[in-house]
């Protein structure tokens, strides 16, 4: 349950203690599980919250002094990135904008929870006509120029993100030989690989279950440029999920699994690897599914989107004129 009225606020002491906590290892259905989904900021959970918080912390002086005290991010409708960024902004006392594809207010499903939570955290929600992620990303770029805000991209400082995740490998048992996890951007699993080397773990193979080609891009951009002494000695075996990104996979598991992300990696693991404590599932997090959080969005529109709207209206008027 998210407590909006008594939400944590930033202090150096709280931040350093909170972000350096090691999340636990548990057992589920015969597999070991790294419960990074239990990392929590006032009810918003998961390892991505830690990544975003550290990214903002590392740039906090710049954001306050050079970016008008604000951050913004672009996100797809199913992505928890909008909620996470807004929650982190509230924690640090920053202004926040998010850009997402515009949708009608009558739609009520789990995909609409993130934008409503963003608004509840105080973010302004900017709607974009282009439903593909390229639409919000372009709008975010335009809004950076318009507002001066600092743009949050989880892949913008890949080395720092990987290092943040790598530190969580410290409490992985020495008998773990195989690690499985979901790969959206892929930085989480690349960070796990980095951590296995950092803490001299006995892991032989890591299976990132990919939802897109982003992991290959980020591996080339961030991981492959590491010094040989910082790279995982075992096999980094990328496998493609049989499910598309937009597909919701609902598994009958007592372990809470995100339907867009973690469930697909868990499904691959159970179909391909026999239960063993030597196999560890890396659970990054789970987004909020409670539909009671949904509220009407007070949509904002960037100057860029308003120009696009005017151009579309002009073309439509021209078509009507030509027809008659």
Question: Model-found features: residue ranges?
Answer:
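Small/polar-residue-rich loop-to-helix segments that shape phosphate-bearing ligand pockets
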Residues: 102-175, 233-256
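Positively charged, low-complexity intrinsically disordered leader regions
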Residues: 1-69
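A short, small-residue-rich loop immediately preceding and capping a beta-strand
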Residues: 63-86, 92-100, 177-185
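Active-site-adjacent helical/loop segments in soluble small-molecule enzymes
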Residues: 146, 232-278, 283-287, 295
């Amino acid at each position: 349950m998210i407590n909006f009225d008594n939400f944590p606020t930033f202090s150096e002491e709280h931040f350093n203690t909170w972000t350096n906590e090691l999340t636990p290892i548990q057992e589920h259905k015969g597999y070991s599980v790294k419960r990074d989904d239990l990392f929590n900021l006032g009810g918003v959970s998961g390892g991505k919250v830690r990544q975003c918080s550290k990214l903002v912390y590392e740039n906090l002086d710049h954001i306050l002094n050079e970016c008008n005290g604000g951050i913004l991010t672009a996100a797809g409708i199913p992505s928890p990135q909008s909620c996470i960024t807004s929650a982190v902004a509230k924690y640090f006392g920053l202004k926040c904008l998010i850009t997402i594809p515009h949708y009608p207010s009558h739609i009520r499903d789990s995909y609409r929870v993130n934008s409503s939570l963003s608004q509840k955290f105080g973010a302004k929600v900017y709607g974009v006509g282009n439903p593909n992620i390229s639409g919000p990303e372009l709008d975010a770029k335009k809004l950076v120029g318009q507002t001066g805000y600092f743009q949050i991209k989880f892949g913008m400082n890949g080395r720092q993100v990987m290092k943040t995740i790598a530190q969580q490998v410290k409490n992985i048992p020495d008998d773990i030989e195989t690690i499985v996890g979901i790969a959206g951007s892929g930085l989480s699993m690349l960070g796990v690989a980095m951590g296995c080397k950092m803490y001299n773990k006995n892991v032989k193979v890591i299976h990132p279950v990919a939802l897109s080609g982003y992991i290959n891009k980020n591996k080339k951009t961030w991981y492959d440029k590491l010094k040989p002494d910082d790279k995982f000695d075992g096999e980094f075996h990328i496998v493609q999920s049989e499910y598309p990104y937009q597909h919701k996979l609902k598994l009958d598991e007592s372990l809470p699994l995100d339907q867009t992300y973690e469930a697909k990696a868990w499904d691959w693991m159970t179909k391909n690897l026999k239960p063993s404590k030597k196999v560890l599932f890396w659970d990054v997090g789970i987004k909020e599914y409670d539909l009671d959080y949904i509220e009407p969005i007070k949509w904002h529109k960037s100057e860029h989107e308003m120009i696009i709207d005017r151009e579309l209206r002009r073309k439509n008027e021209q078509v009507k004129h030509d027809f008659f």
